[in-house]
Amino acid sequence: MFQPAGKRCFTIESLVAKDNPLSSEEPLRPAALPYPGAPAEAFVSGFPSPAGRSLYNNPELVFPETVSHPPLTVHPHQLGASHLQHPHSFFAPQHRDPLNFYPWVLRNRFFGHRFQGGDVSQESLLLHGPFARKPKRIRTAFSPSQLLRLERAFEKNHYVVGAERKQLASSLSLSETQVKVWFQNRRTKYKRQKLEEEGPDSDQKKKGSHHINRWRLATKQPNGEDIDVTSND
């Protein structure tokens, strides 16, 4: 009679023990795997980074490496948590500020006010914001004596240029630009006053005389001869 063979155990421990009789009888347990320091840091941070990285050859665009990572001594299944707890220093608060690597933003009048934080006042937005206006030109306050001298010079000549304007400005302790602007404004005022004095009828008279002169030239009529343009004869 054959005796029944004993039941074979197909556990990992029995199979390993059968192949390696010298091995230990203790079951295998998962253990922490050692990882070198440098590759682990590169894995956690996403990519290896030196002490300072530069996008371009501009010294203003350098990313300083301020956050250092400790050597990795955790279990492999904890790598995901470590990656969330220690993000790369590029995403640190001081690097999220675009002013650190885009210095031209502040020099741009349309975008500079958007990245200045909470210290931006309403006055600075009006001066440097997208709707900033050019500062108004300060009007010169002329003294009565200066105005009198300027009016007399205007009566003699409505256009003062060159050495005459330079001499007049020097005698009044003014700049040539101030004298030039005053004469421009005075000529505009003079023309407006002349139009107001003549009224709308003066324009019609000028147009009528212009047409009559053209008719005389076309028909070669003398100027002294009275011509009845309304006669039907």
Curated annotation (Swiss-Prot):
The keyword Ribosomal protein does not apply. GO terms for molecular function: DNA binding; DNA-binding transcription factor activity, RNA polymerase II-specific. Pfam families: Homeodomain. Residues 192-233 are annotated as: Disordered. Disulfide bonds: none annotated. CDD domains: homeodomain. The keyword Nucleus applies. Residues 135-194 bind DNA. Residues 193-206 have a biased composition (Basic and acidic residues). It is found in: Nucleus. It comes from the Eukaryota. GO terms for cellular component: nucleus. Transmembrane segments: none annotated. Its main location: nucleus. Keywords: Developmental protein, DNA-binding, Homeobox, Nucleus. May function in combinations with OTX1/2 to specify cell fates in the developing central nervous system. Belongs to the EMX homeobox family. This is Homeobox protein EMX1. The lineage of its organism: Eukaryota, Metazoa, Chordata, Craniata, Vertebrata.
